[in-house]
């Protein structure tokens, strides 16, 4: 844990250093931080304004996924949330809403409760990484807002998710 | 003839009984061939004064449609009738009705006085040649459908010994738009799908409406303040109000049988627990206190017990507890998970959604958990609701795929006589009202 915190801190400093710099150096840092060696990704990266919701979605990763009926965070999910926490530390004025979602293979009310649990677990993990609870709200959507509409595991796995949405100024 | 109907009811009961004991072959025990709907002659309502209005014919059609829709009656094609009925006062020629196999005969006439209508009607047993019912109703024109349903209810009751369910409404969610951003609106319609009325604009996501026992209010879930919360909608005044202020999300609401309380779930931390809210003084009472998902509560009709679902065992299962929250006992033990329990208005059965091997089924079991019987099985069936007589269920069935969506179906609790309710678009979350009049 201590090691992880230290790592997060160093990542944070690195990010501060880079993100306050010019866009061309950010591209390199993307590659260092997230292994984004792909040129296409780097292209998108360079267009996002640092601290914007696009920056968050594209460069950090706004969502984590869950197994069927599960509310546990796997290693991939934890890694994404750690990146989200680092980004949120960079922009302390920004708040987020974590939307919980479930796939269509459950009954409506149970899925609402399940998606609430997913959102809460993501938030608890962000809080454990030092993000203040008052910066994070949750909204459970159950199975009401799928991102993928097909009726097979390829879509259901995308729909079992917790999505962090940056609250933008009106 | 009445004995014959009683035999039909007995047959239903026997089928229920046998399908209950032989659980293995649930779906095929009841087949249409086993049941012979009673042939009934429904003569066109005589309307000498206002024939051009067609009101008599309209009422006749609704009565025939209700009775045929129940699966227990077979309205004989009027073209086969040998006798033309010109008056309800004269006794019919029973022989001419027996010849066309009519076991029961309905005759009626309309009399109007300005905007007031009066319908005089009679129901005859063509074999005993006795009158089973002779009555009248006075109504204003806009209530003609209710009147037709009320008469159909009377016929159903006289010939089956059961209460009717035709003069009822269904609250539901009207759906439109793409699957990834579906618009959902609160709506009501008559039990036969007629008179659909949209109650909300679609701006806010709304789900799971349930009728109050008097049919005047709906309790439902709305995202109008961002967070999902339980609201009440007053159908007459169109007013909406939130049911109490809770620290977290409230959902899965239902009225108590006397309409004075709401039971629902409150999400707290990682669990969801059941609360009862008194609507007169807003007192709230905690009924469960665990870190599991406890939801979908439904009172027994005598208000003494509550059935609900909980995943405390690892999967969703059904539990019954005393109305105060004590004496929790699990009642579902089959393969798979069980959810959305609803107690029958008769108190005998609990209807539920069952998920097993990737299939979604509607089933019923006795309140002690015995006698489980699956009524329909497929890709996705969910959310049963009871007709007020406890004989018929509605539920929604979702079709798979990108263009898939939900439609509402009704089915007899024997599994027989499944029918799709025609709605303007996709429709889900049905809730059956009590009898309206």
Predicted regions and their residues:
Chain A
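C-terminal motif of bacterial Sec signal peptides marking the signal peptidase cleavage site
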Residues: 18-21
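Periplasmic peptidoglycan-binding/tethering modules of Gram-negative envelope proteins
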Residues: 23-95, 168-170
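Extracytoplasmic/secreted proteins, especially bacterial periplasmic and envelope-associated proteins
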Residues: 76-83, 109, 117, 121, ...
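A non-catalytic structural micro-motif
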Residues: 92-101, 116-147, 160-170
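A generic structural micro-feature
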Residues: 154-158
């Amino acid at each position: 844990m201590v090691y992880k915190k230290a790592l997060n801190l160093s990542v944070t400093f690195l990010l501060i250093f880079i993100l306050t710099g010019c866009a061309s150096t950010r591209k390199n840092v993307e590659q260092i931080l997230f292994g984004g060696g792909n040129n296409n990704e780097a292209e998108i990266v360079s267009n996002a304004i640092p601290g914007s919701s696009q920056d968050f979605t594209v460069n950090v990763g706004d969502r984590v996924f869950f197994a069927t009926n599960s509310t546990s965070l796997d290693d991939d999910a934890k890694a994404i949330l750690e990146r989200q926490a680092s980004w949120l530390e960079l922009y302390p004025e920004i708040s987020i809403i974590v939307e919980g979602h479930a796939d269509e293979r459950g009954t409506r009310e149970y899925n609402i409760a399940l998606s609430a649990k997913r959102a809460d677990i993501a938030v608890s993990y962000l809080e454990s990484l030092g993000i203040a609870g008052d910066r994070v709200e949750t909204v459970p959507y159950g199975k009401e807002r799928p991102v993928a509409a097909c009726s097979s595991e390829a879509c259901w796995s995308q729909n079992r998710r917790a999505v962090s949405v940056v609250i933008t100024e009106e | 003839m009445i004995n014959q109907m009683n035999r039909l009811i007995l047959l239903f009961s026997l089928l229920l009984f046998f399908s209950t004991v032989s659980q293995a072959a649930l779906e095929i025990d009841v087949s249409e061939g086993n049941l012979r709907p009673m042939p009934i002659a429904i003569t066109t309502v005589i309307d000498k004064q206002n024939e051009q209005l067609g009101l008599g014919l309209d009422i006749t059609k609704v009565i025939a449609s209700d009775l045929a829709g129940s699966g227990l009656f077979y309205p004989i094609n009027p073209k086969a009738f040998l006798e033309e009925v010109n008056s309800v006062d004269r006794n019919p020629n029973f022989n001419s009705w027996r010849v066309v196999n009519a076991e029961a005969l309905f005759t009626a006439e309309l009399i109007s006085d300005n905007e007031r209508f009066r319908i005089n009607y009679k129901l005859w047993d063509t074999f005993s040649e006795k009158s089973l019912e002779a009555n009248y109703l006075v109504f204003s024109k806009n209530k003609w459908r209710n009147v037709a349903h009320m008469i159909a209810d009377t016929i159903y009751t006289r010939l089956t010994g059961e209460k009717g369910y035709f003069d009822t409404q269904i609250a539901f969610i009207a759906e439109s738009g793409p699957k990834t951003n579906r618009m959902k609106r609160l709506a009501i319609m008559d039990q036969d799908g007629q008179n659909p009325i949209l109650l909300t604009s679609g701006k806010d996501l709304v789900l799971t409406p349930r009728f109050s026992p008097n049919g005047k209010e709906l309790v439902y879930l709305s995202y109008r303040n961002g967070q999902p919360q339980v609201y009440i909608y007053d159908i007459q005044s169109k007013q909406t109000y939130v049911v109490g202020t809770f620290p977290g999300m409230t959902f899965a609401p239902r009225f108590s049988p006397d309409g004075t309380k709401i039971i629902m779930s409150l999400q707290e931390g990682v669990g969801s627990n059941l609360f009862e809210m008194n609507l007169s003084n807003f007192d709230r009472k905690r009924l469960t206190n665990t870190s599991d998902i406890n939801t979908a509560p439904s009172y027994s009709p005598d208000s003494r017990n509550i059935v609900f679902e909980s995943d405390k065992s690892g999967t969703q299962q059904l539990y019954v507890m005393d109305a105060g929250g004590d004496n929790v006992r699990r009642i579902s033990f089959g393969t798979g998970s069980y959810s959305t329990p609803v107690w029958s208005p008769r108190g005998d059965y609990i209807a539920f959604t069952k998920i097993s091997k990737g299939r979604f089924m509607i089933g019923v079991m006795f309140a002690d958990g015995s006698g489980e019987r699956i009524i329909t099985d497929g890709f996705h069936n969910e959310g049963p609701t009871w007709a007020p007589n406890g004989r018929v269920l509605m539920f929604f069935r979702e079709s798979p795929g990108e263009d898939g969506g939900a439609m509402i179906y009704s089915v007899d609790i024997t599994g027989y006589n499944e029918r799709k309710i025609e709605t303007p678009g996709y429709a889900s979350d049905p809730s059956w009202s009590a009898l309206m009049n």
